Amino acid sequence: VHRLEGGAEDHATPKLPAHSRHGPAPSRDSLRGLDWFVFFMADVQTGFGPFVSVYLTTQAWTQVDIGLVLTVGSLIALAGQMPGGAVVDAARSERLVAACGVIAISASAFALAAWPIFLLVLLGRVLHAAASCVLGPAMAAISLGLVGHAGIGERLGRNARFASIGTGLAAAAMGALGYLTSSRYVFFATAALIVPTLIALFRIRPGEIDPERAHGGKHDAGLRKLGEGLLALAGNRPLLILAACALFFHLANAAMLPLMGSLLTTRSSDWATVLIAACIVVPQLVVAAFSPWVGRQAQQWGRRPLLLVGFAALPLRGVLFGAVTDPFLLVGVQLLDGISAAMLGVLVPLVIADATRGTGRFNLAQGIVGSAVGIGASLSTTLAGYASDTLGSSAAFFGLAALGFAGLILVWTSLPETRPDAVD
């Protein structure tokens, strides 16, 4: 076995966490299975990004109907965060929950491609949103159940790397597929990805997922204690502060790229598509490169120093977006988005795991923070759009930067260091 605290990372083969009191280290087969499950899940979720509105437009849908379907999906995703986490906490098998979620998303993609009528598409979006609410917590629970707190930092970093690579490759492949054939085949391809996704999932050996570690402690097997769990978490100060910090971060962050995309279109219409694509790809490259390092350093340095770096990059990015006029330099500014994404993508679930250790409510807590993220992101685009229309795009970016700075101050002044002195 390898020590998690030092040494060069083996990029080809996941490291085995040290033997813990809960049982032996997970097998390489399980760890590789988790790598590829994360990768293919990112592929599947990418199929439901901007391709939905493009496809429905080609099917002669009105913008009102498209907007309604997307809004319903967003509302279900927001409302389902806490119930989704509670379902994973109550489940006896995280693999089974994840498999059901994958099947639901695949069915949704197939229905969307085969029968693009309003009712079926609406039901498909609801199904996809509900499945997504359990897949995120299930993936984190499987990770924690396999490696425990001793290895969760590096494991989350590895998850972020594979998710980032999967997202980037899937966006390129599905964009090419839609261009060469039609956007309908993007969703048939998404549905077909159920096969490698489930193969990867079932490479993870169920006996190696420690149920107590997966839930952050001993957990009730039913949903009847959901109220008790919520009350207990309502008194968890680090968790609530983290949720507030996440709300401020996404209140500032969610509107930045769409607003900048509009700005690029007006300043450089000929290059707009290429520049926007570059603004999406550049952060993914940063996340893929640095996420494992973030996971390792979080075990050595603690969570707060790295979180402060991730939060500090956001207001700096907002100020630069408001001040820089060269459209090509704006792509370079997106490197800061990659830094924030690498830091928060690893550290937010890591702090949740720290804060809920021993409670058995790790996944419900993920739902609470996920709800805060959803609220912040939902309000962000509305506030930024209003500010841009009334005060101008530069003022909107400076306003978003101020909100991001408020999140940074909250982390600096209120969020405690959660790294445990002794890990299992």
Predicted regions and their residues:
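Helix-to-loop junctions at the C-terminal end of transmembrane segments
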Residues: G80-S93, G178, F290-G302
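Helix-loop boundary and gating motifs at the non-cytosolic
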Residues: G23-S74, L240-I241, C245, H250-L264
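Structural signature of the two symmetry-related core transmembrane helices
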Residues: L96-F110, P305-L320
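A late C-terminal transmembrane helix in Major Facilitator Superfamily
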Residues: R361-D389
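Symmetry-related core transmembrane helices of the 12-TM Major Facilitator Superfamily/SLC fold
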Residues: Y185-F202, F397-W412
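Juxtamembrane intracellular "pre-TM" segments in multi-pass secondary transporters
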Residues: K15-L31, G207-L242
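Central cavity-lining transmembrane alpha-helices of secondary-active solute carriers
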Residues: L68-A86, V281-W293
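Cytoplasmic helix-loop-helix junction between adjacent transmembrane helices
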Residues: G124-S164, V351, G358
